[in-house]
From Swiss-Prot:
Gene name of this polypeptide: murA
Lineage of source species: Bacteria, Pseudomonadati, Pseudomonadota, Gammaproteobacteria, Enterobacterales
HAMAP family xrefs: MurA (MF_00111)
Protein name, as recorded: UDP-N-acetylglucosamine 1-carboxyvinyltransferase
Family: Belongs to the EPSP synthase family. MurA subfamily.
Species name: Salmonella typhimurium (strain LT2 / SGSC1412 / ATCC 700720)
Record pathway: Cell wall biogenesis; peptidoglycan biosynthesis
Amino acid sequence: MDKFRVQGPTTLQGEVTISGAKNAALPILFAALLAEEPVEIQNVPKLKDVDTSMKLLSQLGAKVERNGSVHIDASQVNVFCAPYDLVKTMRASIWALGPLVARFGQGQVSLPGGCTIGARPVDLHITGLEQLGATIKLEEGYVKASVEGRLKGAHIVMDKVSVGATVTIMCAATLAEGTTIIENAAREPEIVDTANFLVTLGAKIAGQGTDRITIEGVERLGGGVYRVLPDRIETGTFLVAAAISRGKILCRNAQPDTLDAVLAKLRDAGADIEVGEDWISLDMHGKRPKAVNVRTAPHPAFPTDMQAQFTLLNLVAEGTGFITETVFENRFMHVPELSRMGARAEIESNTVICHGVETLSGAQVMATDLRASASLVLAGCIAEGTTIVDRIYHIDRGYERIEDKLRALGANIERVKGE
């Protein structure tokens, strides 16, 4: 397994070009199954999960090519089952189910690896499709959906806010007979992006970005060209990198209006921030950040995917800061690893109390999930000495060439090939 070796401390400064958003690219790739004509999707990040999704679409009979953009022609799709060997590495494959049953009247997706119904919100995808008239069976580890004729529009009130299930219901409803209303819908920018992609293909959707989305079903979707929005979490991660190293950065190909809550907290921490239409700059003027209090919640509140990075910011900031996680359980696995580097923190139920220290020391640490691992790499950039970050396959799932981008900002980081 590959590792990162990071030598610190360094002040990170310079420019970085932000990649397309993984969390919009994946649902958009699967939504392309609804189109009867070719689509071109631009600004798709080069990531493991994207490659897996493209493989899966090919196995279903779509023609998939990548040359800068991703080109998908789903006119010849003739296989309606997403097999376990591809699904096991990636939960996003559940997004194949809605488009398959909506367009072809049938679809099967292997249950995502080690996923028990109820514990993870696959059940919300299922109840949503059932409300649109699909019959769902769970057999031999597969979710099997079918419908006689077309799906039927419905008024769906979601039990809890779920990005994944909002995508599934919205995609399926585009080809349903009649009107579908989704109440308590997720409001994330990636939902808006997926809806806008569907509209480009001829779908009739209104209210995306609010908690009430209305979809008027159409008979077919055509082709089109669409550009995926910039990755707000990658943008936030690089802004934090500059803030904790007392540096300055310019993020290009960014979308500032998707990051209001994060930018507000960075300003509270003492960062000087400017924004343009497609760029964000941050300058610490050589100062140490101040501790901030953060509470995660669904969009437009502070994103859970920026929690680990802000935990790190607080651990090297002036003062004491509180970070409360309300979205996911067990999302503080980076804290004990950062403690190995000299960070001072206590976890009390779903809150981390961070006592800022002046410096961290390099250590051997282990990545546990995507965002936690990014925070460990950033910690290595500012720690005294050498940090080895193990299990970095987590990072490769969500950050495109993070080491190259950090190196361009002055980080001393290398990928070490594992046994």
